[in-house]
Amino acid sequence: SRSSAASDVYKRQPRAIGADLDEVYGLFPRLLERRRQTAGTLSGGERQMLAIGRALMGKPSLLMLDEPSLGLAPLIVREIFAIIDRLRATGVTILLVEQNARAALEVADHGYVLETGDIALHGPARQLAGDPRVIDTYLGAMAQA
């Protein structure tokens, strides 16, 4: 029978799980500080970190993130995207759905711009970040400064 990634986590040796937890705490030191708290008492940013950390415990080859910056303070958004960039560098493939185009394009290798559910543009993230249509519509005048 096929087993899920979640059940595979529990079949692993405690030492391996501890090492994975140390890696997650290395990415999210704030979770280490809050390890005795229940998830319901964490801030929105801490909950986002917890969700990503839980997913990483399963050693995924693909990590899907849907609007990781939604509702978070700008400082926490920067922290989350710095971690996404670090994860990308480890070889984990990340499928990121994000309305914050500037932050998404800074950490992406390739991007897709959707308009009413259809792909309007796609290409290397750096190319999209410099595309006048993307700048005018999604990045605004600040990108031109």
Language-model region placement:
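Catalytic Walker B motif of ABC-type/P-loop ATPase nucleotide-binding domains
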Residues: L63-E67
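Conserved catalytic motifs of ABC-family nucleotide-binding domains
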Residues: K59
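ABC ATPase C-loop
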Residues: A55-L56
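Conserved ABC ATPase signature
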Residues: T38-L42, E46
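Single conserved hydrophobic/aromatic residue that forms the stacking wall/gate
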Residues: S1-A6, Y10
